[in-house]
Amino acid sequence: MTIYRGTFLDTPDNPFTGGTLRVDADAGLLVRDGVILARGAFGDVRRAHPAEDIVDLSGGLVLPGFVDTHVHFPQIRAVGGLGLPLLEWLDRYALPEEARMADVGYAAGVAAEFVRGLAAAGTTSALVFGAHYADAVDVLFSAASEVGLRITSGLVVSDRLLREDLLTTPVRAYTESLALAQRWHGVGRNRYAVTPRFSLSCTDDLLAACRRVLDEVPGSLFTSHVNENEAEIATVADLFGGSDYVSTYDKHGLVDRRSVLAHNVHPTDVDLKVLGETGAAVAHCPTSNAALGSGLFPLSRHLQYGVRVALGSDVGAGTGFSLLKEGLQAYFCQQLIGDQGFSLNSAHLLYLATAAGADALGLPEVGDLSVGKRFDAQLLRPADGSPLAVGVEHADDAEEALARIFTLGTSADVHAVWIDGELLHR
Ligand code: GUN
Ligand code: ZN
């Protein structure tokens, strides 16, 4: 057993429904086999367990590991393709790079960079958009297993309106998806996600095949994109006889508590009602929404309809792996949206980056650092004299220190990361 000594910040109680930031200065967390067995003032935990090893994390702040609910593994080398809206950006930047995943050696190199980037950003769990090629998804799961990340991913499928080399058929999509799920779902920390790219690029037959895979893989998730860009939404309405976007998935039984839909920048009230009633979650991807000019996310309307919301980096339309940056951009977005904006404080941002993500991904064992949870955590320790170190040192209280972390922090300030109490990154 190990006692971690430090200052711990987390959000076990949802700040959108009255919870506040939990702050425990000089606390002790007793961890055995990756699980937090006791938590209290360091002195008390030490007295009760005098013989255990101590890992001293003083001089920094310990947060739960981040949960990234939407990130594309084959797009890391496409980050920074600025200046285009979604459909043009896909054609110009994202899809040519995704086509390179046909070469499994190339995909393996990208997968290694991808898992390192996530871990370095303090992200311990992620719902990852895979590749259109089964072998590339296979190397992603292998790379994630080596590092030990908690990954949910799957084969991305499409059968129309993308470049030819990325298309599949409903039969092949079903067979390849099921084979990958049988190989990886529930193995180590890996889980499978059924992943049609978006209904723009998927026929009803393909979405029906996705539903069959979801049914045949208990505990799998469903993920896709929704209501991101006006031109995309108009095309989807044309293709599906004027339907609201969420219903293009819902009519196939793909929208429920297992579902995580990315973006939802321009939902109708009917879309929000269905998402709220079914318990589906939305991955809010604020830097991507700004970079592609997709729009300002209507958070207040999501909250009104009881829709679960968490954060996604959406690399490569998003601008990097750090959920600190996504939190700050989420805050900016609400400031800019006008009367409808929800004023986010630092507890909201931490919740969106941690516990909300764990909830969206169906991972009740992570998201905060309570007794009974797994020790998935990160130590933020900025370099001495850096603007963040100065800001944290002179903060009046922990909420203010946390706001400064979201404002000034980057992956460079993440000093160490643990999953199940195993040290990943230093
Ligand atoms: N919609 C369909 N594919 C994509 C993608 O790769 N990125 C984003 N942001 N939206 C999408
Ligand atoms: Zn995306």
Name the predicted role of every residue range.
Residues K251-R258, S300-A389:
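His/Asp/Glu-enriched, well-ordered alpha-helical/loop segment
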Residues M1-A48:
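N-terminal metal-binding scaffold of metallo-dependent hydrolase/deaminase domains
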Residues R77-A107, L155, R160-P170, E230-R258, ...:
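Active-site gating loops and adjacent loop-to-helix segments of metal-dependent hydrolytic enzymes
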Residues E230-G242, D271-G276, G293-H302, T319-Q335, ...:
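Histidine/acidic-residue-rich catalytic or RNA/ligand-binding cores of hydrolases
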Residues D135-N264:
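Metal-coordinating catalytic core of metallo-dependent amide/deamination hydrolases
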Residues G81-L149, A173-G186:
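Alpha-helical scaffold segments that flank or form the walls of functional sites
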Residues P15-T17, R374-R426:
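C-terminal cap of metal-dependent C-N hydrolases
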